[in-house]
Amino acid sequence: MSSPSSSLVVLRDLHFGYGERPILEGVTLEIPRGKITALMGASGGGKTTVLRLIGGQYKAQSGSLLFDGQEVSHLSHDQLYAARRRMGMLFQFGALFTDISVFDNVAFPLREHTTLPESMVRDIVLMKLEAVGLRGARDLLPSEIS
């Protein structure tokens, strides 16, 4: 659902932490629609955390996070996947979605950027995983392999 706002991403008073350890406190940010935006700052400043919150990999403890007018934390799995297809994120390190399987991480660009039938996507992904010795890890999350 499109918002009339010129901002595609809106964070309002966002808070996130691990247990009693705060990582982000009261972050407010708007990312304009149709613009390339960079998050820059010191190591440990929360840049990757902000991106993972926007991508729905983490859930904020409080505050509001809208993507195209929709609260990210209220999106279903399918809606979140559809929203991610519209996002372009490049992390300095790592390029995997932490909350989907190894198989789905490899399949993601094929599903997004081609019109291949799912049976062919499956075959290609399994061949790629076999080539790097990860076929047996296809159902694991990235954090479950080293």
Question: Which positions does each model-derived feature cover?
Answer:
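The feature captures the beta-strand-to-loop junction immediately N-terminal to the Walker
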Residues: 40-42
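Helix-to-loop junction immediately C-terminal to a conserved catalytic motif
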Residues: 55
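Conserved ABC transporter NBD signature motif
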Residues: 63-71
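Conserved ABC ATPase "signature" region
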Residues: 70-71, 118-137
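ABC ATPase NBD coupling module
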Residues: 72-88, 112, 118-119
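Short coil-to-helix segment of the ABC ATPase nucleotide-binding domain corresponding to the Q-loop/switch region
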Residues: 99-108
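Conserved ABC ATPase signature
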Residues: 140-146
